[in-house]
């Protein structure tokens, strides 16, 4: 009931997000609202050629990929969804485990009549990406995975004990009340503490995403992404029990964040992993070091399988 009552407010809040300017997607892109199993994803689609799916994480939306999409659109069919409950996608009650969200990605591709895809992911997008790749192994040709771990895999149990990731367990009705109306303050913590240079995340970017996360149910559903980590860990171990991924993977770590540990973790689930560490960057690679990050991605995509 509450979600139905808030639907009009969602439309109003979306206009707040539009008021803050970030790098736009080029005119070659159109948007579609694509129905999946229990959700409707806001998807940007542009270009022609082999498919590339770009998946974002917490603290941003598919908008983070606009600079890369502008480069790839000339050679690829570029598909950029907002994950369920995030950005301009719908806010279903459940389905925030990454196994279910991998199904969202599959349904998007099915709707577009696309079978195979390259995959580029960051943060929580990595977790959805692994769940997709592990369940639909014959649909992924290559994966670029950026600066975040996979629940239940590798050094996960040590990572979740770090005070840096206290937010993994920060959720619940009272926690949501603490953040409500203070979304910008909450998000500033991530941009400031997880970056090598907080000034690289400019005011327009911060205002844009703060407005998106101030939309009704947005923080609630973002917290649900973290709440699903325990189930994600169970699912990931089950995926791994069926064998490692064998297609090529580029694991990108920021030198002030995961660094070489990014590739180390991915090697637990894959056999063909190349490592790239981006200098002078924290977790927010596309904002802090976009040129170096995009150059690394473009270089690996240019390689023939």
What does each model-identified segment do?
Residues 20-30, 39-41, 51, 86-120, ...:
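Flexible "cap/lid" subdomain of the alpha/beta-hydrolase fold that forms the substrate-access gate
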Residues 1-6:
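Bacterial N-terminal signal peptides that target proteins for export
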Residues 281-289, 294:
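Catalytic histidine-centered segment of alpha/beta-hydrolase-like enzymes
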Residues 45-88:
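Conserved HGGG/HGGXW glycine-rich cap/lid loop of the alpha/beta-hydrolase fold
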Residues 11-19:
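Hydrophobic h-region of N-terminal signal peptides that target proteins for export
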Residues 61-62, 127, 282:
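A short, glycine- and basic residue-enriched loop/turn
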Residues 55, 81, 252-254, 278-281:
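Short hydrophobic "strand-cap" motifs at the C-terminus of beta-strands
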